[in-house]
């Protein structure tokens, strides 16, 4: 199939299944993973390679991502270029379709021939559905299969609507043998695809479900090129290759170079070329920027040399002043040291006395400590007793609870047993009733049947009696009916007269009323007008008064509305601000209350201990451990679940306070607590550091706790070095790591892995034992906090009152505003109505007055005669009187008629209706009895089933009762042993006695500790007195030492400046002043080089020399940096400390020397102060920084140059590799293209050539074609048939380069003439034995050469097919005719021979019968003329070609490309020459016409056999007319000659 011009649409109307996507490459996301070669043993190396390239590159020109491009490995060449040729090949055996498109049910298309199979059939029969079936299996979208969605592929016809369709392709590998083939063992496989009505589809390989990717991989492994689809050429697509541009102009289309690159496989290198090209472009830009940065750094460095010289001079003078100052301070320090020695002796004596007191105090403390240890043992013993006591108490409580539950369960089961037995009794009674039901039902049925028979008899008798009395009714009703008939006639006559008189009376009444109205019209109208005038005047007066009142009232309300509209927003803003203040104050108060509330611990123990701390009795009490630290809520479960008990410990600073806490708790009978003193916790400070020296793979719990540093040891003693992981799996993984050896690992949900490997966890996660919000940490509520809370509460109350008052004012004003708006709207509306009414009322009153005056005049004119009116009234009264009389007569007749009808109804009811009512009543009773019979019959039939159901229910109840009885027995067995309960109670009482005994012993110990504590207090007083004496001496000595230290600090602060030595600046030895030496290895410019090469080498030499110069300068500048530490900081922050003098030299300085040094110091300081404003000390450091920056830029430039060179070198290597691979394949394809096209066109020529040989991938490839006996043309300028031939030639040439196992083509011969179709058919049959061709064709000279024909036809709207081998049919026909003894031609060679003989004989007969005309040539003359034309045409062509070859050499009509191939001259250059040659060598047509004006041209002669698709019999009949020239036998040579004549005619035109 030709290349696709655009990618498939992302979505279609079909299913969203991935299997319906067209097999086109989709751009993948860009990634930086290296592209490695495919793994060994991969199922499809080419697929793995393409996937790897797609993961790395998406084909876009995006930005460079700075990844290491040299780590990428280039993909290897495609497998088809390297793997050896196989002896076997793939072929399609047949295609099975099931309800696919026009195929209903299962059908097998084929089997196909190994070489050439032709699909034939009439239009619309379903030939192209074969290609659609292949496309369907190969994974194309529905839109590519001439369908909107997948479900449309399912067969649909009259009465047939299957729910799915399936296509299965049978493949096999074969080895060709003469005339047949052998199937390779175990090479057969099938691929199928099924589509469903819901637009989904599925794949299968050998019947096994598979994915679309697996199908594509399997097809690639058998060399089916599903990427380019060259094996598939659809109808009308063969010419698309001709329409391809040399190179694509947009991303969606494909050019000739891309088309060939895809097939050759060099496109695998294109992403690498683009990637390296982007990197080289960026590196080139970076290189230019780096050179600019280097030059800028050098200029900045040179500009700072003069300020550096001045700064060095200043530093030297400053060092001189510092040295003098140092000598004076050293002399003063020595005087203070001489005072300290006597005081030190007295201090040593007092320390000895204090040591004796301290030893006595330690003895006392040891006794106290022993007492505490004994107390601690006692406390632990009591703790164990308390624990056992609580445990036994809980067991006793649990036993009681369990016994109560057992008794309740026993009671519940016994109740259920009673209930189940009652239900069972009900079912037993129901069963006995059901057993007796059939007998009762039978008796009732028999009784009902008897009643039914009686009712049937009554019904029958009543109906017979009714039918019998009908005749009697007819006899008795004859007289009344006659009378009724006469009365009806009378009534009709009276009714007509009444209607006639009524109409006359109505008309007369209307005339009278009209005349009466006319007489009164003038007077009535005048009265009405006067009333209206009076009413209008009265209304006008009222409305005018109302208008005068409304105007001032409206103005008043309007002013009020404006005032309220202005005041209300202001009031609302004030109220809003007040509410905001109220909300802020409320929030502050709530926050303060929460803080104060959280500070007051809810625990009574903590509260009581805090009071003791405030009283000063337990000074170092801190609180509960969990309240003293904060942790992230994420880790709350980890610490609370695993260390929950430790978080409840009470923390004190000293051990003695821990004892005081315990005594306090015991004395006040408070719950027992565990107290931990901080001074007894031993831990390494390094363990408390947030970042341990050996980092662990997860955070430590101790590092996650935020607390006071003083309390950190308490938390560390609890969690140690425990770390926390996210999950149990992660914890197990970390536990196995060497770094976590000996470390406890916790999880977020509360599990723990101990260092020994034991695992605990699985229970409920505990939370709430430690704070998760730092703001909630406990602190003491001070009086100031309480006062602040009261103040805020008072302020909140005031603000609330003010806000309520403002809110009330706002509501009141809002109501006033609404009322004002309503009033203004009402008054405005009323004012406009009244104003309009007043304005319109005055003109209306004037109009009414004028109308009244006119009406008075009109009334005087209208007068009616009173006599006429009286006569009319008499006529109306007479007619109405007559109407009433006739109406009374008609009513009497109608009443008589009703009497007669009533009499008739009575007779009918007496004789007939009574019997019918009786029959109807019997029928209703009978129907009711029949329903009862049916009901009882159903009860009889259902009785067995109901009894079985009752039996089942009884059995179920029995099982339930038995089950519940067993449970009751089990519960009875579980009764608690009273002896065991009694024993446990005795143990509890014993524990209580032991606890009381320990409590008494504890009180005694507490008393002894109080006595020891008093003695300790006395000794501490004496020790304190000695300590104060020592303190006074120390303070005196400290004052002297402080002065010495102060002097020493000043001496230590005295520093001299480092004086840098910039020797090369003083000598002015610059690199730019040195002479540059040119290296002998530099390339020399050759005079034979092109100007571009010379210019390129000049630029290269300039860059090399510039880099060498700066490298030399870099070496010189580096000397400045050799001593960087000696002058790196010369601004006073980190200068060199001054060298101090020895004590001997200090003692040698006399007072006179000191005074002289003071004077000299002042002079130096004045000089330094004078120079300080003129110099910039920071210029020295800045200069050093500039030198460093310059050297860094030089190093960066060197590195950038080397990186650019390496990337550019790799880019050129990949480009060259791509070009060489492409060029070798390109030459192979081009050579075979020329050979194939020359064979197809009988002498034509075609070639693929580079538009730009240096870079064919940029400009592309042009496809040049020279049809036989014509000039060179671009393929897009050819005719349709020539385009088809050119495209097919390229397809066949590509087949030789990259063979495809099979080809499926749809009417590729549609645009070809008879001769070219035959050539294509012969080529397919003879020249391509290594492939299978399946061609759909309607041309007989194509399908007649096929090895096998598959006929497609339709029956009842469904497609069917049949396959035959033409040669086999002919052989069978030959055998049949031979067996019958008939000489009939059946084989193709025999038929051709017989046809040629028949043609020769008919031509001879035509010549013999031909009449001779003096003015017309004979047949022999015409034949001679044709031969002459043929010979002269060939001679003329050869002469023209020779002339072109001679003239093209000096005039350079053809150019030679870089690869040695000759390019044809342009059409404009060759056109004049061809015209000249036509003049030199006249056309053969002129010679032919000169012999006779009436002889047909060769073109017309060819029309004799123009339609060569006509059967031989018809062609022989058409040639039998005497006026046509004799026909020659059909041989290949004669056909070629005729075609040559036609081509000559085309050239002459």
UniProtKB/Swiss-Prot annotation:
Feature: compositional bias, Polar residues: 1440-1459, 1510-1523
GO cellular component terms, semicolon-separated: chromosome, centromeric region; condensed chromosome; condensin complex; nucleus
Residue stretches of biased makeup (Basic and acidic residues): 37-59, 396-407, 420-444, 1460-1474
Main location group: nucleus
Stretches assigned to the SMC hinge domain: 619-734
SMART domains associated with the record: SMC_hinge
Source domain of life: Eukaryota
Residue numbers binding ATP: 121-128
InterPro entries named among the record's database cross-references: P-loop_NTPase, RecF/RecN/SMC_N, SMC, SMC_hinge, SMC_hinge_sf
SUPFAM superfamilies the record matches: P-loop containing nucleoside triphosphate hydrolases (SSF52540), Smc hinge domain (SSF75553), Tropomyosin (SSF57997)
Disulfide bonds: none
Keywords: ATP-binding, Cell cycle, Cell division, Chromosome, Coiled coil, DNA condensation, Meiosis, Mitosis, Nucleotide-binding, Nucleus
GO molecular function, one term: ATP binding
Phenotype of the disrupted gene, per the record: RNAi-mediated knockdown disrupts prometaphase chromosome organization and chromosome segregation in mitosis and meiosis II and leads to aneuploidy throughout development. Disrupts mix-1 localization to mitotic chromosomes. Increased levels of phosphorylated air-2 at the spindle midzone, indicating activation of the abscission checkpoint. Results in cleavage furrow regression and failed cytokinesis during the first and second embryonic divisions.
Pfam family, one: SMC_hinge
Biological processes, Gene Ontology terms: cell division; meiotic chromosome segregation; mitotic chromosome condensation; mitotic sister chromatid segregation; positive regulation of nematode male tail tip morphogenesis
Entry text on domains: The flexible SMC hinge domain, which separates the large intramolecular coiled coil regions, allows the heterodimerization with mix-1, forming a V-shaped heterodimer.
PANTHER family for this protein: STRUCTURAL MAINTENANCE OF CHROMOSOMES PROTEIN 4 (PTHR18937:SF173), STRUCTURAL MAINTENANCE OF CHROMOSOMES SMC FAMILY MEMBER (PTHR18937)
Described purpose of this protein according to its UniProt entry: Central component of the condensin I complex, a complex required for conversion of interphase chromatin into mitotic-like condense chromosomes. The condensin I complex introduces positive supercoils into relaxed DNA in the presence of type I topoisomerases. Converts nicked DNA into positive knotted forms in the presence of type II topoisomerases. Also a central component of the condensin II complex, a complex that seems to play a role in prophase chromosome condensation. Both the condensin complex I and II play a role in meiotic and mitotic chromosome segregation.
Homology family: Belongs to the SMC family. SMC4 subfamily.
Protein name, as recorded: Structural maintenance of chromosomes protein 4
Annotated source species: Caenorhabditis elegans
């Amino acid at each position: 199939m030709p290349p696709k011009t655009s990618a498939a649409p992302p979505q279609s109307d079909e299913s969203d299944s991935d299997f319906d996507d067209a097999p086109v490459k989709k751009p993948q996301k860009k990634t930086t993973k290296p592209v490695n070669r495919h793994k060994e043993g991969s199922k499809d190396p080419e697929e793995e390679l393409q996937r790897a390239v797609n993961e790395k590159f998406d084909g876009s020109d995006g930005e460079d991502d700075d990844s290491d491009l040299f780590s990428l490995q280039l993909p290897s060449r495609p497998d088809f270029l390297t793997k050896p040729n196989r002896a076997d090949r793939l072929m399609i055996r047949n295609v099975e379709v099931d309800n696919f498109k026009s195929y209903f049910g299962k059908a097998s298309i084929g089997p196909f021939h190994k070489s050439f199979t032709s699909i034939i059939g009439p239009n619309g029969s379903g030939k192209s559905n074969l290609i659609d079936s292949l496309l369907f299996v190969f994974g194309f979208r529905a839109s590519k299969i001439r369908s909107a969605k997948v479900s449309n592929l399912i067969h649909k016809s009259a009465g047939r609507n299957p729910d799915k369709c399936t296509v299965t392709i049978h493949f096999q590998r074969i080895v060709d043998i003469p005339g047949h083939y052998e199937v390779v063992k175990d090479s057969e496989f099938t691929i199928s695809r099924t589509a469903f009505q819901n637009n989904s589809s599925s794949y299968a390989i050998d019947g096994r479900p598979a994915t679309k990717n697996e199908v594509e991989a399997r097809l690639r492994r058998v060399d089916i090129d599903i990427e380019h689809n060259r094996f598939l050429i659809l109808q009308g697509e063969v010419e698309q290759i001709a329409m391809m541009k040399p190179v694509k102009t947009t991303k969606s289309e494909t050019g000739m170079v891309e088309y060939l690159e895809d097939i050759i496989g060099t496109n695998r290198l294109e992403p690498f070329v683009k990637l390296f090209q982007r990197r080289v472009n960026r590196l080139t830009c970076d290189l230019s920027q780096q050179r600019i940065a280097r030059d800028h750094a050098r200029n900045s460095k040179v500009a700072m040399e003069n300020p550096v010289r001045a700064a060095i001079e200043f530093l030297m003078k400053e060092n001189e002043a510092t040295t003098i100052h140092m000598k004076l301070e050293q002399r003063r320090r020595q005087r203070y040291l001489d005072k300290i020695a006597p005081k030190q002796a007295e201090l040593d004596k007092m320390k000895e006395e204090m040591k004796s007191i301290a030893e006595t105090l330690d003895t006392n403390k040891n006794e106290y400590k022993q007492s505490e240890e004994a107390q601690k043992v006692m406390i632990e013993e009591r703790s164990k007793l308390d624990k056992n006591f609580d445990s036994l108490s809980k067991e006793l409580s649990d036993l009681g609870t369990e016994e109560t539950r057992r008794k309740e369960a026993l009671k519940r089961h016994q109740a259920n047993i009673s209930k189940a037995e009652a239900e069972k009794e009900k079912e037993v009674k129901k069963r006995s009733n059901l057993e007796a039901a059939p007998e009762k039902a039978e008796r009732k049925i028999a009784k009902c049947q008897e009643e039914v028979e009686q009712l049937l008899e009554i019904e029958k008798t009543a109906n017979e009696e009714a039918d019998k009395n009908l005749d009697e009714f007819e006899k008795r009703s004859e007289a009344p009916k006659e009378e009724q008939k006469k009365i009806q006639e009378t009534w009709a006559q009276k009714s007509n007269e009444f209607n006639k008189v009524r109409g006359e009376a109505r008309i007369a009444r209307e005339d009278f009323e009209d005349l009466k109205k006319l007489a009164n019209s003038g007077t009535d109208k005048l009265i009405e007008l006067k009333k209206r005038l009076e009413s209008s005047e009265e209304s006008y007066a009222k409305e005018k008064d109302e208008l005068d009142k409304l105007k001032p009232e409206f103005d008043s309300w309007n002013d009020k509305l404006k005032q309220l509209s202005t005041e209300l927003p202001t009031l609302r803003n004030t109220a809003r601000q007040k509410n905001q203040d109220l909300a802020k104050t409320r929030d502050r108060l709530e926050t303060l209350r929460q803080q104060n509330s959280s500070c007051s611990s809810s625990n009574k123990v903590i509260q009581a201990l805090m009071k003791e701390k405030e009283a000063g009795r337990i000074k170092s009490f801190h609180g509960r451990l969990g309240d003293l630290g904060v942790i992230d809520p994420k880790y709350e479960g980890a610490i609370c679940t695993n260390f929950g008990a430790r978080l409840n410990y009470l923390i004190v600073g000293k051990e003695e306070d821990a004892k005081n806490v315990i005594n306090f708790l015991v004395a006040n009978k408070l719950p027992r607590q565990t107290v931990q003193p901080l001074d007894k916790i031993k831990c390494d400070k390094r363990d408390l550091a947030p970042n341990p020296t050996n980092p662990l793979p997860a955070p430590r719990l101790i590092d996650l706790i935020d607390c006071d540093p003083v309390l950190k040891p308490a938390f560390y003693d609890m969690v140690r070095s425990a770390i926390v992981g996210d999950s149990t799996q992660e914890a197990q993984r970390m536990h196995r790591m060497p770094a976590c050896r000996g470390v406890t690992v916790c999880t977020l949900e509360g599990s723990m892995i101990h260092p020994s490997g034991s695992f605990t966890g699985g229970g409920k996660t505990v939370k709430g034992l430690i704070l998760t919000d730092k703001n909630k940490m406990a602190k003491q509520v001070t009086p100031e906090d309480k006062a602040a809370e009261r103040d805020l509460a008072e302020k909140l109350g005031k603000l609330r009152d003010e806000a309520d008052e403002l809110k009330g004012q706002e509501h009141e004003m809002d109501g006033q505003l609404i009322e004002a708006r309503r009033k203004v709207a009402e008054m405005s509306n009323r004012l406009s109505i009244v104003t309009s009414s007043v304005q319109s009322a005055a003109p209306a009153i004037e109009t009414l007055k004028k109308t009244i005056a006119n009406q008075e005049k009109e009334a005087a004119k209208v007068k009616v005669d009173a006599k006429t009116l009286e006569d009319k009234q008499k006529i109306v009264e007479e007619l109405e009187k007559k109407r009433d009389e006739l109406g009374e007569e008609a009513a009497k007749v109608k009443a008589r008629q009703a009497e007669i009808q009533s009499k008739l109804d009575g007779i009918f009811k007496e004789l007939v209706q009574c019997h019918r009512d009786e029959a109807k009543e019997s029928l209703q009773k009978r129907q009711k009895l029949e329903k009862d019979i049916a009901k009882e019959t159903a009860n009889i039939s259902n009785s067995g089933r109901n009894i079985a159901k009752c039996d089942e229910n009884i059995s179920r109840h029995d099982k339930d009762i038995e089950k519940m009885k067993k449970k009751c027995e089990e519960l009875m067995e579980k009764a608690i042993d009273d002896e065991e309960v009694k024993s446990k109670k005795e143990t509890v009482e014993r524990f209580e006695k032991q606890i009381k005994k320990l409590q008494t012993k504890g009180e005694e110990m507490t008393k002894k500790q109080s006595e020891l504590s008093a003695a300790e207090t006395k000794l501490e007083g004496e020790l304190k007195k000695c300590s104060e004496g020592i303190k006074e001496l120390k303070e005196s000595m400290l004052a002297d030492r402080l002065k010495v230290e102060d002097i020493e600090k000043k001496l230590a602060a005295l520093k001299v400046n480092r004086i840098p030595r910039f020797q090369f600046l003083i000598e002015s030895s610059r690199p730019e002043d040195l002479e540059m030496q040119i290296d002998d290895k530099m390339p020399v410019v050759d005079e034979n080089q092109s100007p571009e090469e010379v210019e390129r080498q000049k630029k290269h030499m300039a860059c090399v020399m510039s880099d060498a110069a700066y490298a030399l300068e870099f070496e010189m500048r580096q000397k400045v940096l050799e001593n960087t530490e000696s002058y790196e900081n010369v601004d006073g922050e980190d200068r060199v400390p001054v060298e101090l003098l020895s004590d001997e030299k200090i003692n040698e300085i006399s007072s006179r020397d000191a005074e002289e040094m003071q004077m000299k110091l002042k002079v130096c300081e004045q000089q330094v102060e004078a120079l300080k404003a003129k110099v910039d000390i920071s210029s020295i450091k800045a200069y050093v920084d500039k030198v460093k920056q310059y050297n860094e830029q030089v190093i960066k430039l060197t590195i950038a140059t080397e990186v650019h060179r390496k990337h550019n070198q790799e880019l050129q290597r990949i480009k060259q590799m791509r070009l060489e691979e492409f060029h070798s394949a390109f030459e192979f394809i081009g050579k075979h293209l020329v050979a194939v096209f020359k064979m197809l066109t009988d002498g034509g020529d075609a070639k693929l050539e580079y538009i730009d040989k240096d870079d064919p991938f940029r400009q592309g490839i042009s496809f040049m074609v020279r049809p036989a006996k014509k000039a060179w043309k671009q393929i897009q300028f050819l005719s349709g048939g020539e385009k088809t031939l050119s495209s097919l030639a390229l397809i066949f040439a590509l087949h030789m380069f990259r063979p495809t196992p099979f080809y499926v083509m749809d009417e590729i011969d549609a645009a070809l003439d008879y001769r070219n179709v035959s050539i294509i058919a012969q080529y397919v049959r003879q020249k391509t034995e290594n492939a299978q061709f399946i061609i759909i064709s309607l041309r007989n000279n194509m399908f007649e050469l096929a090895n096998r024909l598959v006929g497609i036809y339709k029956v009842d709207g469904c497609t069917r097919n049949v396959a035959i081998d033409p040669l086999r049919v002919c052989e069978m026909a030959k055998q049949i005719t031979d067996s019958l003894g008939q000489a009939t031609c059946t084989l193709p060679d025999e038929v051709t021979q017989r046809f040629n003989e028949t043609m020769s004989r008919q031509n001879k007969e035509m010549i013999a019968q031909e009449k001779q005309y003096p003015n017309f040539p004979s047949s022999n003359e015409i034949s001679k003329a044709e031969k002459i034309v043929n010979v002269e045409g060939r001679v003329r062509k050869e002469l023209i070609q020779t002339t072109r070859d001679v003239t093209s050499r000096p005039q350079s009509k053809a150019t030679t490309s870089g690869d040695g191939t000759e390019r044809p001259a342009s059409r404009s250059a060759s056109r004049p020459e061809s015209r000249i040659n036509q003049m030199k060598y006249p056309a053969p047509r002129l010679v032919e016409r000169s012999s006779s004006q009436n002889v047909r041209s060769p073109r017309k002669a060819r029309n004799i056999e123009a339609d060569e698709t006509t059967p031989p019999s018809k062609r022989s009949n058409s040639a039998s007319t005497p006026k046509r020239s004799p026909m020659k036998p059909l041989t290949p040579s004669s056909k070629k000659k005729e075609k040559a004549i036609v081509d000559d005619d085309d050239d002459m035109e």
